[in-house]
Amino acid sequence: VLSVKSLKTTTRQVDYLTEEQMNNLINLPPIDTSTGIRHRIIMCLLYDTGARVQELCDLKIEDINLGNNPTVKLHGKGSKIRIVPISKNMNQILEVYISKFYSNIKLKNEYLIKNKNNQQMSRDGIEYIVQKYATILKNNDPSFPSKVHPHMFRHSKAMHMLAVDIPIVYIRDFLGHEDISTTMIYARADSRKKNEAINNLAPKLIEENYVDWSKDQDLLDFLNSFK
């Protein structure tokens, strides 16, 4: 029995932004230029859909369903497809973006996000854009992370969903995880939940087990002897 090695477990570090940091980052690109609009759309989609960076690169006009119940079709790992709901704000932003850049209905099979050469946006291109604006924020706010990558938008979305008590099973489906144990890294990283659980137990412990030591003079004399 002693020769059997114990199973090693590791806790993955989850890098994410607060809601305030995320809002500041997303709203940084100017919307009075085509480039600024495109950059804002990229970051809005990364956060709102929780998409992996390659899923965003592969997104086409035909994958966007706008209207009363807007959704985005993401093409994930292993050719797996998942339908993700998007917010009303994201719906409005996409309506404006598509009408401005893709008014021709024949372009349904075109990639939603393109680079300045009118080609499919690459992973490196999106990483560059995200880091560009993160660096600007960092220069103005020392507390802002110096390194921000596209996957942090996905992490941040999961953590923010967890913070408003969205069930972990729904978060798993939203992110497209096969195994819920992958999603559980966010639950383990949420210290707010841990503190909440501890604080919920605290009143009972105090109420049921609290002893007023101030009335026990012998005990007080004993404790004072250690001074």
Residue ranges and their predicted role:
Residues 1-227:
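Conserved catalytic core of the tyrosine transesterase superfamily
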